[in-house]
Amino acid sequence: MIEPLLCGIVLGLVPITLLGLFVSAWNQYRRSSSMPDWE
């Protein structure tokens, strides 16, 4: 049996973690392209 609190924490952290990884990857991609317009 899984505790509701633990389940809620996991369901809350997983999307945030995936979003953080996506944002960090997008920042590295945008930085490597070095577009002056985004500065």
Swiss-Prot record:
It is a single-pass membrane protein. GO terms for biological process: cytochrome complex assembly; photosynthesis. The chain crosses the membrane at residues 5-25. Keywords: Electron transport, Membrane, Photosynthesis, Thylakoid, Transmembrane, Transmembrane helix, Transport. One of its GO terms (molecular function) is electron transporter, transferring electrons within cytochrome b6/f complex of photosystem II activity. The keyword Lipid biosynthesis does not apply. GO terms for cellular component: cytochrome b6f complex; plasma membrane-derived thylakoid membrane. It is found in: Cellular thylakoid membrane. Its main location: membrane. HAMAP family: Cytb6_f_PetG. Component of the cytochrome b6-f complex, which mediates electron transfer between photosystem II (PSII) and photosystem I (PSI), cyclic electron flow around PSI, and state transitions. PetG is required for either the stability or assembly of the cytochrome b6-f complex. The 4 large subunits of the cytochrome b6-f complex are cytochrome b6, subunit IV (17 kDa polypeptide, PetD), cytochrome f and the Rieske protein, while the 4 small subunits are PetG, PetL, PetM and PetN. The complex functions as a dimer. Belongs to the PetG family. This is Cytochrome b6-f complex subunit 5. It comes from Prochlorococcus marinus (strain NATL2A).
